[in-house]
A protein has these predicted regions:
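C-terminal interaction surface of TIR/SEFIR-family domains
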Residues: 1-60, 64-66, 123-242, 250, ...
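TIR-domain catalytic/interaction hotspot
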Residues: 52-56, 63-114, 232-280, 328
Length: 353
């Protein structure tokens, strides 16, 4: 298995997303990086489990890759900087704010900044796992780092800075995180010095599956639920068999985007009545929500009128509508909810279909 949280029906394999072949760069990368490892840095007491998992999964996905993790490889704390100097890149786990109060973590980071090592930035926001929001981490960093170092560690969108990769623990989403980490690790290797991108896929992974529909789908979006408009049109753009309907009667499904605020006020009351009527009429509702806007679905449930909860509105799981590298997973989860079969690109049914 790729992770304790992933149980695929076939052994996943990292392949080029362009041609579905094992990336040749990985072979050269592994051979040339053995003496220049990927250095993993994190707050040792709070975020050890995450980096241990990342190391284990990268070794499965990129056979032969050399990865330095102090609990496995450190011989002398006094020589910490020399280990950074011997590395090709550094993976920084942005999790606990205690990272920026640790003398040794700051030593590692300072040496990487001095050497201008490529940084693979991975963010764990899960507070239950000692994670924290990026703005809080940036504030903590700004107290201990120079402005340019804080900028390099947290800025996004600049051409020279790759994205900050969210670390998620749910299987299909974690696959997206791992593939993105592997892409950035490859791009930091000598083998890819002149390569702009190396899009990768996990063979059999949901994010790279091709949804197929037996019949066309028409999605209704209520004017009382404007948050559903953009996801509905994105689904219609991504999935050829899906369209958007202004009429509930003409639609096959209703996409309802729920949040703690969606049933508030007069408009929310009207939406509640509309949902009640649709539920009573046996309409097929597909629910979605944003974990990036609301960190716990229980807040959505608590804010939902009791009558809707009692009527079974949440008997079917709401789709996590995520952005960035995880959007492909959200789109395919929505496609499954709309009746699609997930076909692996190499043929056969995708895991989790």
């Amino acid at each position: 298995t790729i992770s304790p949280t992933i149980a695929p029906t076939v052994s996943p394999q990292l392949v080029s997303a362009r041609d579905r072949l094992r990336p040749q760069a990985a072979v050269t990368f592994s051979d040339r990086l053995l003496s220049a490892p990927l250095f993993l840095t994190r707050e040792r007491r709070a975020n050890q489990d995450v980096v241990a998992t990342i190391k284990r999964q990268l070794q499965l996905l990129l056979p032969g890759v050399s990865i330095f993790l102090d609990v496995d490889d450190l011989e002398s704390i006094d020589a910490l900087e020399s280990y950074v100097q011997a590395s090709q890149a550094m993976l920084v786990l942005l999790g606990s704010s205690q990272y920026f109060t640790s003398r040794n973590c700051l030593r590692e980071l300072a040496e990487a900044q001095r050497l201008s090592l490529p940084l693979v930035r991975v963010h764990d926001a899960d507070a239950a796992k000692n994670g924290a929001p990026l703005p809080s981490l940036r504030t903590a960093a700004s107290r201990r780092l120079q402005r340019q170092d804080t900028t390099r560690l947290f800025d996004v969108g600049a051409a020279q800075l790759p994205i900050i990769i969210p670390w998620l623990r749910i299987g299909h989403f974690q696959q997206g995180s791992l593939a993105s980490i592997a892409e950035q690790v490859l791009l930091a290797s000598p083998a890819c010095v002149d390569v702009a991108s190396v899009p990768l896929a996990l063979k059999g992974g949901l994010a790279w599956a091709e949804p197929t529909f037996a019949q066309p789908v028409a999605l209704f979006v209520s004017q009382l639920n404007p948050a559903a408009t953009e996801p509905a049109h994105e689904l219609a753009s991504a999935l050829a068999e899906v369209g958007v309907s202004a009429s509930l009667d003409a639609a096959t499904h209703w996409l309802l985007f729920v949040s703690p605020e969606c049933f508030e006020g007069e408009q929310g009351q009207q939406l509640e009545a509309q949902v009640q009527a649709a539920t009573a009429a046996g309409r097929r509702l597909v629910l979605a929500w944003s974990p990036e806007a609301c960190d716990d679905f229980k807040h959505v449930i608590e804010a939902t009128p009791h009558a809707l909860v009692s009527a079974g509105l949440y008997e079917t799981l709401a789709i996590e509508w995520r952005g960035g590298v995880h959007r492909r997973v959200s789109v395919r989860l929505a496609a499954k909810a709309l009746g699609a079969q997930m076909m692996a690109s190499s043929g056969g049914t995708c895991e989790g279909a």
